[in-house]
C-alpha cells in the first residue's frame, strides 16, 4: 500500500526577485558598517531532501532569543513557478518559537540593532544643544504607539537637518536668555563636548527591502 503523502505547512511571504538585494545589504551592514556584526549569514544552499533551496540570516536578540529570516527559491516547480521567491520570518525564544510579521520583526530588530535616541536627548533639545544621537531605524516605530518624547525629537532632528526656518529662528530669539542661563548652569556637563550623531543611512525595514506586499 502506498504511503500517504504528508505536507508540512509554514507561513511564508511571497516576494519579487529581491533576495540578492537583501543578501547584499546584510553583508554590507555586517562587514562594512558593523551595524549587524552579530548577525549570522548562511549563504544560499540546497536542502538535501527537498526540491527548493534556501538561505538564512540569524539575528541574535536579547535574553537568548533570536530572529531568523529564511529565503526560499523554487517553491512550486509543479506549477512552473521556477522563479518564485519567498521568505519566512521566525522568532525563537528559550521556551517557544513563532512566525512573525515583517512589522513585528522590525520592532524586534530595533530592540538590539541600530541606535535610537538616548535618554539625555530631551534635555539637550530643551537647552538648544546639538543632539548627540539619532534614530537609525525609524520604520520600527511606525507600528508602535510613539511616546511624546520620541515624536518631539523626530521633529527637532528634521527641522535642524533642513536648516533653520523663520519660525525656528523666532523661537531661538524669544528663548535666547533662558537658553543662555541653562547652558551656564550645565557648563560642567561633560557630554556637551561629545561626538556628533552617529552617521549612516537609516535601515528601511524588512518589508521594504524584500518588497513584501509591494
From Swiss-Prot:
It is found in: Host cytoplasm; Host cell membrane; Virion. A motif (BC-box-like motif) lies at residues 147-156. One of its GO terms (cellular component) is membrane. The modification Phosphothreonine is found at residue 98. The modification Phosphoserine is found at residue 147. The keyword Membrane applies. It is a peripheral membrane protein. Processed in virion by the viral protease. It holds the Pfam family Vif. Residues 154-166 are annotated as: Multimerization. Keywords: Host cell membrane, Host cytoplasm, Host membrane, Host-virus interaction, Membrane, Phosphoprotein, Ubl conjugation, Ubl conjugation pathway, Virion. The keyword Membrane applies. InterPro entries: Vif (IPR000475). Induction: Expressed late during infection in a Rev-dependent manner. One of its GO terms (biological process) is viral life cycle. Residues 180-203 are annotated as: Disordered. Disulfide bonds: none annotated. A motif (HCCH motif) lies at residues 110-141. Belongs to the primate lentivirus group Vif protein family. Homomultimer; in vitro and presumably in vivo. Interacts with viral Pr55Gag precursor and host APOBEC3G. The interaction between Vif and APOBEC3G is species-specific, which may play a role in restricting the replication of SIV to their host. Forms an E3 ligase complex by interacting with host CUL5 and elongin BC complex (ELOB and ELOC). Counteracts the innate antiviral activity of APOBEC3G. Forms a complex with host APOBEC3G thus preventing the entry of this lethally hypermutating enzyme into progeny virions. Functions as an adapter molecule, recruiting APOBEC3G to the ubiquitin-proteasome machinery. Targets APOBEC3G for degradation through the assembly with elongin BC complex, CUL5 and RBX1. Binds viral RNA and affects the stability of viral nucleoprotein core. May play a role in viral morphology. The BC-like-box motif mediates the interaction with elongin BC complex. The HCCH motif (H-x(5)-C-x(18)-C-x(5)-H) mediates the interaction with CUL5. Vif-defective viruses show catastrophic failure in reverse transcription due to APOBEC-induced mutations that initiate a DNA base repair pathway and compromise the structural integrity of the ssDNA. In the absence of Vif, the virion is morphologically abnormal. This is a macaque isolate. This is Virion infectivity factor. It comes from Simian immunodeficiency virus (isolate Mm142-83).
Amino acid at each position: 500500500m502506498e504511503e500517504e503523502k504528508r505536507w508540512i505547512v509554514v507561513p511564508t511571504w511571497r516576494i519579487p526577485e529581491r533576495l540578492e538585494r537583501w543578501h547584499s545589504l546584510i553583508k554590507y551592514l555586517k562587514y562594512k558598517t558593523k551595524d549587524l556584526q552579530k548577525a549570522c549569514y548562511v549563504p544560499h544552499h540546497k536542502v538535501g531532501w527537498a526540491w527548493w533551496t534556501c538561505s538564512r540570516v540569524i539575528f541574535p536578540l536579547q535574553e537568548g532569543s533570536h530572529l531568523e529570516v529564511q529565503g526560499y527559491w523554487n517553491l512550486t516547480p509543479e506549477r512552473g513557478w521556477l522563479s518564485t521567491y519567498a521568505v519566512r520570518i521566525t522568532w525563537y525564544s528559550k521556551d517557544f518559537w513563532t512566525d512573525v510579521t515583517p512589522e513585528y520583526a522590525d520592532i524586534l530588530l530595533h530592540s538590539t540593532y541600530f541606535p535610537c535616541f538616548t535618554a539625555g536627548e530631551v534635555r539637550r533639545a530643551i537647552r538648544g544643544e546639538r543632539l548627540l544621537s539619532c534614530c537609525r531605524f525609524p520604520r520600527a516605530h511606525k507600528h508602535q504607539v510613539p511616546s511624546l518624547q520620541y515624536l518631539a525629537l523626530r521633529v527637532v532632528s528634521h527641522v535642524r537637518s533642513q536648516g533653520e526656518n523663520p519660525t525656528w529662528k523666532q523661537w531661538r530669539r524669544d528663548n535666547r536668555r533662558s537658553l543662555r542661563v541653562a547652558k551656564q548652569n550645565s557648563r560642567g556637563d561633560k557630554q556637551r563636548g561629545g561626538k556628533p550623531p552617529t552617521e549612516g543611512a537609516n535601515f528601511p525595514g524588512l518589508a521594504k527591502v524584500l518588497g513584501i506586499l509591494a
